[in-house]
Amino acid sequence: MARRPTPPGTPQPTGIGHIVDLVRHAIPPLHPAGLPFVLAPLGVAALGRNRKWVRRAGLTTAAACATFFRHPHRVPPNRIGVVVAPADGEVALVDNAVPPAELNLGSEPRPRVSIFLSVLDVHVQRSPVGGTVKEVVHQAGKFLSADLADASEVNERNSMLIETADGHDVAVVQIAGLLARRIVCYAGVGDVLPIGDTYGLIRFGSRVDTYFPAGTTLLVEPGQRTIGAETVIAQLP
């Protein structure tokens, strides 16, 4: 995995470790997937250093990409049965919907929370629960605007099913959008993910849907902002 969250109860570092943590909190590190997008404009800036406008454009683009691919540190809650937001963004939908057919979860609607990621949000996705990965399926599709209701059905997506230690199935779906045309998923079947663990990335925004078992209590509303790995979006039955 790209980066694991700090488990609750972890002792605070001291000395140099404490200083490093302070720097990480002030300046979030870069996700490895963003490295080419930062190095390329830096190279342009270096080659065109004698031309002010080229140098400025290269440095500005590199800074923007570094911001887009930032990977901030997060600390998930330690409450039993909670589901955390799989991404930073804005809650777009809180409803009931049929999970992606490729996950074989049946045709009955399940509670769902959809989070829309803009180009200014953090692009990484984090495991909404701790558990074992049972399915990972990539589905080709269209690239409609991710804020449309039917984007979850027709757009390119990557669906992952996680089984918690209590036997609950939670599905999390990365959905490509109008600008986001590259979905990355590092998790594989059999992997054991801690809650809040980084497992994937959608380049330049998009949407992430989470499907819950029946009886789950949803704790967010449309329009609410979420912080990946920290905002509690639901309580499992």
Curated annotation (Swiss-Prot):
Free-text remark on how the cofactor is bound: Binds 1 pyruvoyl group covalently per subunit.
Cofactor(s) required for function per UniProt: pyruvate
Annotated site residue numbers, Cleavage (non-hydrolytic): 205-206
Residues forming coiled coils: none
Mod. after translation: Is synthesized initially as an inactive proenzyme. Formation of the active enzyme involves a self-maturation process in which the active site pyruvoyl group is generated from an internal serine residue via an autocatalytic post-translational modification. Two non-identical subunits are generated from the proenzyme in this reaction, and the pyruvate is formed at the N-terminus of the alpha chain, which is derived from the carboxyl end of the proenzyme.
Gene Ontology terms: biological process: phosphatidylethanolamine biosynthetic process
Pathway the protein takes part in: Phospholipid metabolism; phosphatidylethanolamine biosynthesis; phosphatidylethanolamine from CDP-diacylglycerol: step 2/2
PANTHER family: ARCHAETIDYLSERINE DECARBOXYLASE PROENZYME-RELATED (PTHR35809:SF1)
Subunit description: Heterodimer of a large membrane-associated beta subunit and a small pyruvoyl-containing alpha subunit.
Name of the protein described by the UniProt record: Phosphatidylserine decarboxylase proenzyme
